[in-house]
Amino acid sequence: MGTVNITVSDGVRYAVADEGPNASEAVVCLHGFTGSKQSWTFLDEMLPDSRLIKIDCLGHGETDAPLNGKRYSTTRQVSDLAEIFDQLKLHKVKLIGYSMGGRLAYSFAMTYPERVSALVLESTTPGLKTLGERRERIMRDRKLADFILRDGLEAFVAYWENIPLFSSQQRLAEDIRYRIRSGRLRNNKIGLANSLTGMGTGSQPSLWSRVEEIDVPVLLICGEWDEKFCAINQEVHKMLPSSRIEIVPKAGHTVHVEQPRLFGKIVSEFLTSI
C-alpha cells in the first residue's frame, strides 16, 4: 500500500506507511522524539512476512503539527492510534516502541489491552514515579520547547545530538550520523516543542503501578552503554517475570540505529516465537 494519509475524527492528518501482506494483525512501529517512520525502514527486509505499519507520531515527520499543545497529550494520541487501527482494519497489533514511542506503546497497551498481542519496548519507561520528578521534568521540557521555538531547529538539533544520552552515536559512521541529523531537521519546530510539553515524560501519567497488568508477551531491549534505561528495563522485567530482556552489546540508547541488524534479528526471533 505504501504511505497513506489517515485523518482522525478532529481532522488531524497522520502519515502512515503500510507495507507487507494485508492482514488484520500487524506489527506497528512507533518512533522516538525527533524521529519519524523512516527510522524503521530497515525492518522491511527483516520482517518480510509481516504487515508492517510505521507511523509518523503527532508533530513529527509528515504528520500534522497542531498549534494547540494540549492536543499532544498521551491520552489523545492513544485515541488517535485506536482510530488509525480502525481505519486500517487492524483488530490486533504487535507494538514496537522506542523511547517516546515506547511510552506511547505502554499507554496504548494499558488503555486497549484487548487490541495488543505483543510489546517490544526499546529504551523506554512506564514514566516517572514521583510527582516531584514529573514537575522537574515538565520544567526542563518547557525550557527545551522554548529553546526550539526561539532558536529554531538547526540550533536545537546541534544541541540535541550532543547530549549524553546519544554520546554513543558519535561512534557511528559519518554518513549514518548525517542521515540521523537530516531526519531530525525535517521535523517541524512547533510539532517538536508541543510534543515535549504535551507528552513529555513529565506530562505523562506514571504507569509504574499498572505494569503488572500487562498480560501479553513483552520484549525489553536496551543498549549496554545506556545504564539508566537498562536499570529501568531490569526493574520492569522483575515485575513481568515472563518478559524477555535483551541487553545489546556495543549500543547506547538508540539500539535500532547503532545495531540495526542485531536489533532486527532479536525482534524477528521474538515475534516468531510467540
Swiss-Prot record:
GO CC terms: membrane
* GO molecular function annotation: 2-succinyl-6-hydroxy-2,4-cyclohexadiene-1-carboxylate synthase activity
Please write the reaction equations for the catalytic activity of this protein: 5-enolpyruvoyl-6-hydroxy-2-succinyl-cyclohex-3-ene-1-carboxylate = (1R,6R)-6-hydroxy-2-succinyl-cyclohexa-2,4-diene-1-carboxylate + pyruvate
GO terms (BP aspect):
menaquinone biosynthetic process
User: Which residues fall in a coiled-coil region?
Assistant: none
Keywords of the record, alphabetical order, are:
Lyase, Menaquinone biosynthesis
The pathway this protein participates in, as annotated, is:
Quinol/quinone metabolism; 1,4-dihydroxy-2-naphthoate biosynthesis; 1,4-dihydroxy-2-naphthoate from chorismate: step 3/7; Quinol/quinone metabolism; menaquinone biosynthesis
Gene3D superfamilies (alphabetical)? alpha/beta hydrolase (3.40.50.1820)
InterPro entries per the UniProt record, alphabetical: AB_hydrolase_1, AB_hydrolase_fold, Epox_hydrolase-like, SHCHC_synthase_MenH
Which residue numbers delimit the AB hydrolase-1 domain?
26-259
Is Lyase among the key words of this record? Answer: yes
The reply on keyword Lyase is yes
- Similarity annotation: Belongs to the AB hydrolase superfamily. MenH family.
Described purpose of this protein according to its UniProt entry: Catalyzes a proton abstraction reaction that results in 2,5-elimination of pyruvate from 2-succinyl-5-enolpyruvyl-6-hydroxy-3-cyclohexene-1-carboxylate (SEPHCHC) and the formation of 2-succinyl-6-hydroxy-2,4-cyclohexadiene-1-carboxylate (SHCHC).
Subunit text = Monomer.
What PANTHER family does this protein map onto?
2-SUCCINYL-5-ENOLPYRUVYL-6-HYDROXY-3-CYCLOHEXENE-1-CARBOXYLATE SYNTHASE, PROTEIN PHYLLO, CHLOROPLASTIC
What this protein is called in its record is Putative 2-succinyl-6-hydroxy-2,4-cyclohexadiene-1-carboxylate synthase
